[in-house]
């Protein structure tokens, strides 16, 4: 019973100590918060020479007391933790070995898949090469088409060649008027004259349209005959399909497509050349304008110098003349000119000095801003370090309190009953 009473007294003492420690920690936290607020209010500037991280002696003393109190109760816990850590290490080693084996298997599978894909790509390339080798001979556009295209390119006309005109559908002749319709129409002389004139004009228009259509058909037939002759000469009639219409049309369509592509390419090249010329002309224009501005400035300077030299010449002439010839008006004019020159020189010097002063002020302001930024960064880093130290101490204190409370609970649980 005496031993039990002693243990209970010790536990009560430990409870009291824990309560005191918690109160002290709360006070320390409040003090730290107050210090942070004061630092933020003051916005003081810290330098690396006079900066020293403050050390709380109270925290160290409390930590030492806590460590002394916890050393007695932590022996059992450390032994248990060591056994648990050993088991965990064994489990982690087993898991790592299994993961490495699975990763190796996955890598091997990926390599096999990549090899298969490469083989398939090689086979596809070989098939494409074979197909290209067995492809028919390339078709070229007709000579007339090339000539027309070259003429347009030489003239610089960016117009695509029109397609071949489709065969116009011939209109059916108007149906003959029946006897009833003829009888129903009036027989006045004015209407008869208008009908005859309209019929004559329609007949003339029909004849003109027919002539134009015949000319178009003739040109189409001539081009088709030329292209067919070229196809026959080039050996395109391999299957003996020259008399047929389908293969010949397909050939003609292919040639027209290729010719159109070539014509578009030439158009693009011509446009690109024009753009390059325009850019070069713009560059030369800018250089010429800069030269002109420079020459105008030099011209103005020369004019000013000539004007000043005229004044000096007048002054020299007046000085060389006898005093009887020199008038007071001439002397006053010369003095005014000299004063004007001196004033202009003084103004130029003042402007240069002002510009230099402004540049120096700007440089000083930039340097001051950089220094302020560096000091602010340094202050922020120091504040962050202080906060990190405070949080670290708080975490350590909390961990120690939790361990003490756990140990006390375990002791209370292990006490024998009364």
From Swiss-Prot:
Pfam families: bZIP_1. One of its GO terms (cellular component) is nucleus. Residues 51-75, 95-149, 165-196, 211-252, 336-418 are annotated as: Disordered. Residues 8-47, 324-362 form a coiled coil. Residues 51-71, 95-134, 180-196 have a biased composition (Low complexity). This is Probable basic-leucine zipper transcription factor E. Residues 220-239 have a biased composition (Acidic residues). InterPro entries: bZIP, bZIP_sf. PANTHER family: BASIC-LEUCINE ZIPPER TRANSCRIPTION FACTOR E-RELATED (PTHR47416:SF8), BASIC-LEUCINE ZIPPER TRANSCRIPTION FACTOR F-RELATED (PTHR47416). It is found in: Nucleus. Probable transcriptional regulator. Belongs to the bZIP family. Transmembrane segments: none annotated. Residues 169-179 have a biased composition (Basic residues). Residues 246-309 form the bZIP domain. Residues 274-281 are annotated as: Leucine-zipper. Keywords: Coiled coil, DNA-binding, Nucleus, Transcription, Transcription regulation.
């Amino acid at each position: 019973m005496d031993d039990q009473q002693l243990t209970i007294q010790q536990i009560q003492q430990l409870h009291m100590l824990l309560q005191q420690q918690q109160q002290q920690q709360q006070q320390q936290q409040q003090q730290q918060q107050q210090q942070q607020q004061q630092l933020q209010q003051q916005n003081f500037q810290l330098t690396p020479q006079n900066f020293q991280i403050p050390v709380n002696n109270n925290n160290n003393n409390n930590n030492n007391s806590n460590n002394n109190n916890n050393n007695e109760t932590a022996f059992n816990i450390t032994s248990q933790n060591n056994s648990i850590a050993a088991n965990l290490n064994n489990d982690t080693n087993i898991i790592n070995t299994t993961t490495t084996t699975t990763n190796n298997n996955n890598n091997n599978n990926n390599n096999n898949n990549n090899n298969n894909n490469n083989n398939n790509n090689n086979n596809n390339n070989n098939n494409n090469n074979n197909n290209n080798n067995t492809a028919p001979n390339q078709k070229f556009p007709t000579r007339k088409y090339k000539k027309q295209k070259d003429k347009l390119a030489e003239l610089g006309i960016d117009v695509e060649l029109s397609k071949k005109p489709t065969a116009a559908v011939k209109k059916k002749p108007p149906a003959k008027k029946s006897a009833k319709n003829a009888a129903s129409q009036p027989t006045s002389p004015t209407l008869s004259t208008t009908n005859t004139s309209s019929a004559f004009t329609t007949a003339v228009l029909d004849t003109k349209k027919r002539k134009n259509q015949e000319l178009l058909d003739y040109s189409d037939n001539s081009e088709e005959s030329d292209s067919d002759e070229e196809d026959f000469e080039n050996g395109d009639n391999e299957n003996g399909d020259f008399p047929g219409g389908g293969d010949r049309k397909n050939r003609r369509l292919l040639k027209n497509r290729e010719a159109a592509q070539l014509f578009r390419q030439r158009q693009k090249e011509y446009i690109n050349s024009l753009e390059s010329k325009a850019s070069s002309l713009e560059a030369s224009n800018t250089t010429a304008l800069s030269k002109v501005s420079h020459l105008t400035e030099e011209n103005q300077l020369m004019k000013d110098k000539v004007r000043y030299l005229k004044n000096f010449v007048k002054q020299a002439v007046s000085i060389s003349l006898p005093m009887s010839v020199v008038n007071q008006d001439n002397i006053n004019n010369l003095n005014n000119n000299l004063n004007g020159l001196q004033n202009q020189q003084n103004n130029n010097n003042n402007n240069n000095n002002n510009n230099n002063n402004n540049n120096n002020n700007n440089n000083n302001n930039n340097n001051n801003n950089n220094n302020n930024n560096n000091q602010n960064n340094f202050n922020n880093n120091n504040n962050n370090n202080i906060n990190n130290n405070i949080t670290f101490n708080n975490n350590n204190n909390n961990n120690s309190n939790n361990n003490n409370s756990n140990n006390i609970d375990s002791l209370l649980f292990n006490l024998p009953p009364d």
